[in-house]
Amino acid sequence: MTDHEETSTQKAVSLTDTNDLFQLLNELESRFLPMRSHEKKEVDIGRIQQRPHKIGEYPGSVYIEIPIEIKNKIMEETNQFSQDFKPIQSLHISLTKEFSLREHQIPLFVQEVRKKIKRFPTFTITFGQLELLLNPEQNTEFLSIQVTSPEILSLIDLLDTVMMSFNLEKYYEERKIHSSLMYRTEHLKEPYELLSFDKCLVSFKPATIKIRLGEIVYTCVLGGNSM
């Protein structure tokens, strides 16, 4: 057998191994990732990626979705700011920094997150004061509400262990847990008198957390809940 023939055979074996790998990954995905949904692509500045997108990678984030009834209560209370700020369509609480994964990493990442949080006890999310936050580029200001539940810090610590196992960045050292409600790109840093919220009126118990990777959202059930 010539050197050329040996090289061609090696390439064929390599191609077969690659096909087997993709088949195995597809089987794993169907087994471990049943709760996922395709969402309509919407222009929502609250979820715009700040990190540059690389070809072959899927931008991702892990977050808690704020229920519509809680969102409506908060937006009613902050209606006075609507003349100067534009509303953000879907309210959420970020639990990780933005990150990127390659396609073959996605099944294992989702599996690891689900494994970590399935025993995490149910807790109540409460809100505190409103605050104005600037983005890193200093060109957009967000009207945000503080999240005051101490349990959410433990949840972030737990997710940090998953992030590090995939060589991804941990959450910010200076933790300002919040949900952005509205934004503006003009008259930045203009002072406002911001109000507080009654914890009893604006609170909820999350049953799940979400993982968004590209346009697909995966649902992960928190411990003490069933779906």
Model-derived regions, located:
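Histidine-dependent nucleotide/RNA phosphoesterase domain, centered on the 2H-phosphoesterase fold
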Residues: 1-227
